[in-house]
Amino acid sequence: MDLILDDRQDKLEVSEELIEKIKDIIIECLDYEGYDDNYEVSLSFVDNKEIHELNREYRGVDRVTDVLSFPLLSDDFEDVELEEESLGDIVVSLERALEQSIEYNHSFEREVCFLICHSMFHLLGYDHDTDENTKEMREKEEHILNKLNITRE
């Protein structure tokens, strides 16, 4: 498994322990969907200003968000073999993750882990565009986080 990490913010430090949890989440998401670990994921940590700009540029939404996912695989994901294939890019605003961890009353690490898990399922072709799809995605996210004992503390 290749994780390409680009920390483009200077507001919050990211521990090695959190990086290891992120790797575990990525591997578990793929395993849960029946794929092996012959893949690459690009992960960028940014601040609110940068994610706001990216959200406006790529989604046409003029506000800060917590995470953006840029899948590189086609919609026919089931037909794609992951042989050293790049799944795509995940961009997380650590600044927003900290704000949300306070808002939801759990740890910063738990919030970042949730955002990575959420984004991984986007890279794997899932979306939350309907109530049914949202429910399916939430169940998958909770399964992965519970399996790795990443709780709301």
Curated annotation (Swiss-Prot):
Report which superkingdom the organism of origin falls in. Answer: Bacteria
Which keywords, in A-to-Z order, does the entry hold?
Cytoplasm, Endonuclease, Hydrolase, Metal-binding, Nuclease, Ribosome biogenesis, rRNA processing, Zinc
In alphabetical order, the GO MF annotations are: metalloendopeptidase activity; RNA endonuclease activity; zinc ion binding
Record text on cofactor binding: Binds 1 zinc ion.
Q: Which InterPro entries match?
A: MetalPrtase_cat_dom_sf_prd, YbeY
State where Zn(2+) binds: 118, 122, 128
EC number assigned by the record: 3.1.-.-
Required cofactor names:
Zn(2+)
A GO biological process this protein is involved in? Answer: rRNA processing
Q: Which HAMAP family match?
A: Endoribonucl_YbeY
Official protein name in the record? Endoribonuclease YbeY
| Source organism | Clostridioides difficile (strain 630)
